[in-house]
């Protein structure tokens, strides 16, 4: 009776040590360095509205989906057969 109790406690402690429940806490990583905004000029500064609209590949939300535009975009990428608008119509998913 005592042997099984000691064995079960030992297995429990060993299992908790392996899962990291009693492990020492890891140090918190330093905050990421944010670069100066003037060091990287705005990428969209020289683009007109037509160029910015093309970046969504037709998936501009659930009420403004153009699956064919997304499908044609994915077909233009080597290795993909087509695509569709996913994640509520905001993401062009290629297959």
UniProtKB/Swiss-Prot annotation:
GO terms for biological process: defense response to bacterium. Disulfide bonds join 59-85, 70-92, 74-94. GO terms for molecular function: potassium channel regulator activity; toxin activity. Beta-D-GlcNAc-(1->4)-Mur2Ac(oyl-L-Ala-gamma-D-Glu-L-Lys-D-Ala-D-Ala)-di-trans,octa-cis-undecaprenyl diphosphate binds at residues 57-59, 67, 73, 84, 86, 88, 92-93. Residues 24-55 form a propeptide. Residues 61-64, 86-92 are annotated as: Binds to membrane interface. Changing residue 84 to A/C/D/E/F/G/H/I/K/L/M/N/P/Q/R/S/T/V/W: Complete loss of antibacterial activity. InterPro entries: Defensin_invertebrate/fungal (IPR001542), Scorpion_toxin-like (IPR003614), Scorpion_toxin-like_sf (IPR036574). Changing residue 67 to A/C/E/F/G/H/I/K/L/M/N/P/Q/R/S/T/V/W/Y: Complete loss of antibacterial activity. It holds the Pfam family Defensin_2. One of its GO terms (cellular component) is membrane. CDD domains: Knot1. Gene3D superfamilies: Knottin, scorpion toxin-like. The keyword Transport does not apply. Its main location: secreted. Antimicrobial peptide that potently acts against several species of Gram-positive bacteria. It selectively inhibits peptidoglycan biosynthesis through complex formation with the cell wall precursor lipid II (1:1 molar ratio) thus inhibiting cell wall synthesis. It does not disrupt cell membranes. Is especially active against numerous clinical isolates of S.pneumoniae, including all 90 different serotypes and isolates resistant to clinically used antibiotics. In vitro, shows considerable selectivity for bacteria over mammalian cells. In mice infected by S.pneumoniae, it has an efficacy comparable to vancomycin in the peritoneal model and to penicillin in the pneumonia model. Belongs to the invertebrate defensin family. Type 2 subfamily. This is Fungal defensin plectasin. It comes from Pseudoplectania nigrella. The lineage of its organism: Eukaryota, Fungi, Dikarya, Ascomycota, Pezizomycotina.
């Amino acid at each position: 009776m005592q042997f099984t109790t000691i064995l079960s406690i030992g297995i429990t402690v060993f299992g908790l040590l392996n899962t990291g429940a009693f492990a020492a806490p890891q140090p918190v990583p330093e905050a990421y360095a944010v670069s100066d905004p003037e060091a990287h000029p705005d990428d969209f500064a020289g683009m007109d509205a037509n160029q910015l609209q093309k970046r969504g590949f037709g998936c501009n939300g659930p009420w403004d989906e153009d699956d064919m535009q997304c499908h044609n975009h994915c077909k233009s990428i080597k290795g993909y057969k087509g695509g569709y608008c996913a994640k509520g119509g905001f993401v062009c998913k290629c297959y």
